Amino acid sequence: MTNIIELPEVLANQIAAGEVVERPASVVKELVENAIDAKSSQITVEIEESGLKMIQVTDNGEGMSHEDLPLSLRRHATSKIKSQSDLFRIRTLGFRGEALPSVASISKITIKTATKEVTHGSLLIATGGEIETLEAISTPTGTKIKVENLFYNTPARLKYMKSLQAELAHIVDVVNRLSLAHPEVAFTLISDGRQLTQTSGTGDLRQAIAGIYGLNTTKKMLVISNADLDFEVSGYVSLPELTRANRNYMTILVNGRYIKNFLLNRAILDGYGSKLMVGRFPIVVIDIQIDPYLADVNVHPTKQEVRISKERELMALISTAISESLKEQDLIPDALENLAKSSTRHFSKPEQTQLPLQSRGLYYDPQKNDFFVKESAVSEKIPETDFYFGAVDNSVKVEKAELLPHSEEVIGPSSVKHASRPQNTFTETDHPNLDLKNRQKLSQMLTRLENEEQSVFPELDYFGQMHGTYLFAQGKDGLFIIDQHAAQERVKYEYYRDKIGEVDSSLQQLLVPYLFEFSGSDFINLQEKMALLNEVGIFLEVYGHNTFILREHPIWMKEEEIASGVYEMCDMLLLTNEVSIKTYRAELAIMMSCKRSIKANHSLDDYSARNLLLQLAQCQNPYNCPHGRPVLINFSKADMEKMFRRIQENHTSLRELGKY
């Protein structure tokens, strides 16, 4: 009797489903890709309970014949390849014939389909991979597939599902990627009767980007294009000022297929060069057209890993396309806009970019307890122009996005203010990059900060500054050199730590509320984590498509910090999966202290420098910044005398050494 048997087809399909169907988003991906391969121009995705209860995908594609319909549930049955040679010139998204039978084996599936050549369509109902009904019906041309009770016969998979909001965010991300890959298709995503995503299907990639990431983001995207004999590279990349805290906003498409490729990600970052801050990543949508012979998509059942021949040449092509596009842009006006934002409430741009040849110092305002740029340092008149409704400076040659038709009420400039994300204002040398995903390292840092004891700070007399970075002071113990960024980071950390920790019901009403735009998946994830934001005094309300509105802010947050501060808080939440309120408050204090501190290469006047040293002396631990770096170093009088050889290491005379 043989011990080796051929597994039943249903069991084999359930095993295959372990790789193909990881979560509800995997089902959406496979069904939508089949609809795209069927040459659909309209695809509607409807889900209930984040896809665990029901997923329905409706398209207006070619449909299936009555004879082909039952074959579609057979393993490795496909219409997309016929011979071995076809495997090397695949242009469809699917070809393995595994997805539909795998999905059918772990759910109840209902398929209605019809082709334009016949007068009637077909209905198929199957449960657990077993066909229960196959009959002729009247239905429009195209296919409608409904998947119900997903994972009903694989309870272990259900056990490891994340929350409904997290699973929904994955589905939104899948639909967004597919809509970017195929802007010629009109996508609609509906969850529990609520529309989450809708694209126009005009074929304009820029419009698709605007529909997903918002108009404000699209205005800061640059078009790129490059080609050689093997590859054609096109798409859009964000200006260096517009970045995110992770790679989730980097979309690479190969022949209409979203892929993950570390080397191509590296090529994108190389194209930006030193314009990107460490730990920040651009928003990118890059479409690569390639001969199928040069790409092997038959690597993994999910088909997200692709092996590409001449990968080094492709990397160089991408890097060159991005760097050349950035070279054409005059980035100076955006830097000046940053300066204007720090001194005026309105979002504005200067009329000209030439600055007077005089020192631009930082000064201290004791009433606001903060540093500021003296207004006389910039003598040009700055017209007040609303950020959203005003004209964009022509010196930044960025293609303007076409305004998409929107069903919502048009909001005037006097009713709300569109918040803009923080721009990169410090360098890698200011502080080590704070890795929010390294929970062990963060835990050690927070433990160290919690156990700090009160320190005694020496009395210092400030007398100068070097390179706009280091302060010089003298005390009874000798010379002290202070890192101004680390010093104010410590001062700000203890301020935010106390203020965020004692959040109460005291909120300041905003005369003009702020609007905050997010991508669909981030918008959903933030709704799930909103309680943490509420604990630190930030109350965001849903306001239209992928948008929150902020009507009030905690009294400890300065109004000029609201736009960048709230975005930074949200980005921080999105990077952490599970975090306690105590930990979030502590991490938030570290992040905000660094973002709000003066940076290197900024001159301080004498009053501001002395005031910084006074604030530092009042800190619980004035000797280290929150990251653990030293705030100051000391050269004693004896150290100085040794360096200048005013005293010898020992008492041996020069005559005894034979010098004289």
UniProtKB/Swiss-Prot annotation:
Transmembrane segments: none annotated. PROSITE patterns: DNA_MISMATCH_REPAIR_1. CDD domains: HATPase_MutL-MLH-PMS-like, MutL_Trans. Keywords: DNA damage, DNA repair. It holds the Pfam family MutL_C. SMART domains: DNA_mis_repair (SM01340), MutL_C (SM00853). GO terms for cellular component: mismatch repair complex. It comes from the Bacteria. One of its GO terms (molecular function) is ATP hydrolysis activity. GO terms for biological process: mismatch repair. This protein is involved in the repair of mismatches in DNA. It is required for dam-dependent methyl-directed DNA mismatch repair. May act as a 'molecular matchmaker', a protein that promotes the formation of a stable complex between two or more DNA-binding proteins in an ATP-dependent manner without itself being part of a final effector complex. HAMAP family: DNA_mis_repair (MF_00149). Belongs to the DNA mismatch repair MutL/HexB family. This is DNA mismatch repair protein MutL. The gene is mutL.
